[in-house]
């Protein structure tokens, strides 16, 4: 099975759930950029302090800072990894690639979890988050598609993209992902 992976997909497609399962089953390091940021901030590392200052101003953490945090995690990593939540744009992907090349850890596969909007909206509303109403969700899906479409094309052109239909049980989706990575 391929060992250096990216997960892409719209909000509600099950990326986090499937990433956790795959990482546990194959001893991959799960690199969720949101979790990494929170860990760095909590540990009060220099990168974490820089990220905290930005987040406390209500701003988005820069691509450069996220890349530095990802690099920090990967430079001591000998085994496989799954990057979840980054890159989200083509610009981020093009910044990530030289770093991975330098570390001699190129991406081996990109898993795109796809699901129709009706199911995504239903899943997100059922989570019960206060900001998950239908109009907000539709807007998030539109932003996702706008930002991610060029990224999907980029990985498709590189021959890395594996598309998996994320409809069905957690187990059946996990099996489809596993098959796509062999």
Curated annotation (Swiss-Prot):
Disulfide bonds: none annotated. One of its GO terms (cellular component) is cytoplasm. It is an enzyme of class 2 (transferase). Pathway: Purine metabolism; AMP biosynthesis via salvage pathway; AMP from ADP: step 1/1. Pfam families: ADK. It comes from the Bacteria. Its EC number is 2.7.4.3. GO terms for molecular function: adenylate kinase activity; ATP binding. Residues 32-61 are annotated as: NMP. It catalyses: AMP + ATP = 2 ADP. Monomer. Consists of three domains, a large central CORE domain and two small peripheral domains, NMPbind and LID, which undergo movements during catalysis. The LID domain closes over the site of phosphoryl transfer upon ATP binding. Assembling and dissambling the active center during each catalytic cycle provides an effective means to prevent ATP hydrolysis. Belongs to the adenylate kinase family. This is Adenylate kinase. It comes from Prochlorococcus marinus (strain MIT 9313).
